[in-house]
């Protein structure tokens, strides 16, 4: 398995809107290998979700595993939220915005339709952390980041903090 490079804010490629995946592509060996590489990258980061857009693949799919043991991998291809209920404030972080956390308001429960890893249509009702994670990763597929929910001033502070972090690493 390959470790894929994760794009970091403010990389403009993170703003690219992803295109749908052809259903026939889902079961191809190349797509399955990419999914394995994405899970490997997510687990190593470590994270609980990774959208294809974050690894510079601008197609509508993402991988998620919110389990503590990292043994419940979920694949969402062409996800679509069909209903939302309630609202919750949740502190979010992001592999593309390392070291930054902020409160974001999201639907508390959602119903999402998608294709699974085998290309089969599924519908899932999710709440709590899973609902937040799905919404967060779907934002990536639309070229949106959790920092977009922040005020312009806070967003600029995040950009400067990340630039400073990168300078110290270089």
Curated annotation (Swiss-Prot):
Pfam families (alphabetical): Pep_deformylase
EC code: 3.5.1.88
Catalytic activity: N-terminal N-formyl-L-methionyl-[peptide] + H2O = N-terminal L-methionyl-[peptide] + formate
Enzyme class, UniProt record, top EC level: hydrolase
Signal peptide residues on this chain, from the entry's feature table: none
Gene3D superfamilies listed in its UniProt record: Peptide deformylase
Entry keyword set: Hydrolase, Iron, Metal-binding, Protein biosynthesis
Domain of life: Bacteria
Coiled coil stretches, renumbered: none
Binding site for Fe cation: 94, 136, 140
Cofactor(s) for this UniProt protein: Fe(2+)
Note accompanying the cofactor annotation: Binds 1 Fe(2+) ion.
SUPFAM superfamilies in the record: Peptide deformylase (SSF56420)
GO MF term list: metal ion binding; peptide deformylase activity
GO BP of this protein: co-translational protein modification; translation
Catalytic site: 137
Function noted in UniProt: Removes the formyl group from the N-terminal Met of newly synthesized proteins. Requires at least a dipeptide for an efficient rate of reaction. N-terminal L-methionine is a prerequisite for activity but the enzyme has broad specificity at other positions.
Recorded family membership: Belongs to the polypeptide deformylase family.
PANTHER family tied to this protein: PEPTIDE DEFORMYLASE
HAMAP family: Pep_deformylase (MF_00163)
Protein name: Peptide deformylase 2
Species: Xanthomonas axonopodis pv. citri (strain 306)
Encoding gene, per UniProt annotation: def2
